[in-house]
């Protein structure tokens, strides 16, 4: 399948043609997307899990019985991953960890003059929510790139949302990162659930 339907050679275009390409018309359309997202957020705030179920069917074409993935399924995800991929995920985890550990900043505590103490202290959030897209390609590397810095920062709880059904690669990457709360919910409804909470999330 050819995804590059239109190829433009920038140097051969005049100014008006260049501006037209840069205008990104999909973002300049009417407010339909913005209005839809606003409605989704309001419905999740007001109707919780019922709204999540409705939007899973509407947007993901998936009827979710249980949003939370059982911990046993997360742990056993390694059974469905080939050894090369497991190895690659573990190497990536090590590399990402090394990179982010090198960025840890020291606490600053100085006395600028007698009786005046100035501090710069870094405190982690208690819990963070991360969203992992799960469309035509499983973006399990995003799990590593989001969860590892949160762990290093000292976040006690990481909650992951991803559209249903969640790919085993995402589950395995989550397991490797120590994520125990995984919910199969996608889109704006997932972000709203993470922000405002529902009966389940």
From Swiss-Prot:
**A Pfam family per the record:** Histidinol_dh
Organism in which the protein naturally occurs: Buchnera aphidicola subsp. Diuraphis noxia
Question: Can you list the GO cellular component terms from the UniProt entry?
Answer: cytosol
UniProt EC number? 1.1.1.23
Please give the biological process terms from Gene Ontology that the record holds.
L-histidine biosynthetic process
Q: What InterPro entries is this protein classified in?
A: Ald_DH/histidinol_DH, Hstdl_DH
| Cofactor(s) required for function per UniProt | Zn(2+)
**What lineage is on file?**
Bacteria, Pseudomonadati, Pseudomonadota, Gammaproteobacteria, Enterobacterales
**UniProt pathway:** Amino-acid biosynthesis; L-histidine biosynthesis; L-histidine from 5-phospho-alpha-D-ribose 1-diphosphate: step 9/9
Instruction: Quote the catalytic activity from the record.
Output: L-histidinol + 2 NAD(+) + H2O = L-histidine + 2 NADH + 3 H(+)
What the record notes about the co-factor is: Binds 1 zinc ion per subunit.
Going by the entry's taxonomy, the superkingdom of the source organism is recorded as Bacteria
Name the chain's protein.
Histidinol dehydrogenase
**Tell me, how does this one assemble?**
Homodimer.
Gene3D superfamilies per UniProt = 1.20.5.1300, Nitrogenase molybdenum iron protein domain
Give the keywords, sorted: Amino-acid biosynthesis, Histidine biosynthesis, Metal-binding, NAD, Oxidoreductase, Zinc
Q: Which molecular function GO terms apply here?
A: histidinol dehydrogenase activity; metal ion binding; NAD binding
Function comment: Catalyzes the sequential NAD-dependent oxidations of L-histidinol to L-histidinaldehyde and then to L-histidine.
Report the sequence similarity comment from the record: Belongs to the histidinol dehydrogenase family.
């Amino acid at each position: 399948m050819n995804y590059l339907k239109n190829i433009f050679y920038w140097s051969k275009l005049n100014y008006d043609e260049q501006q037209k390409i840069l205008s990104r018309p999909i973002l300049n359309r009417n407010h339909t997307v913005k209005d839809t997202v606003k409605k989704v957020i309001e419905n999740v705030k007001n109707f919780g899990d019922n709204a999540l179920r409705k939007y899973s069917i509407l947007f993901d074409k998936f009827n979710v019985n249980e949003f939370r993935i059982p911990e046993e399924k997360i742990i056993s995800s390694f059974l469905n991953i080939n050894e090369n991929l497991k190895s690659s995920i573990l190497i990536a985890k090590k590399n990402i960890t090394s990179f982010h550990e090198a960025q840890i900043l020291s606490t600053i505590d100085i006395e600028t003059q007698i009786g005046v103490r100035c501090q710069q202290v870094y405190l982690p959030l208690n819990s963070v929510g991360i969203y992992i897209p799960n469309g035509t390609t499983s973006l399990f590397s995003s799990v590593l790139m989001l969860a590892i810095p949160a762990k290093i920062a000292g976040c006690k709880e990481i909650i992951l949302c991803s559209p249903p059904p969640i790919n085993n690669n995402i589950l395995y990457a989550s397991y490797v990162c120590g994520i125990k709360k995984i919910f199969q919910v996608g889109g704006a409804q997932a972000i709203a659930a993470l922000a405002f909470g529902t009966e389940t999330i």
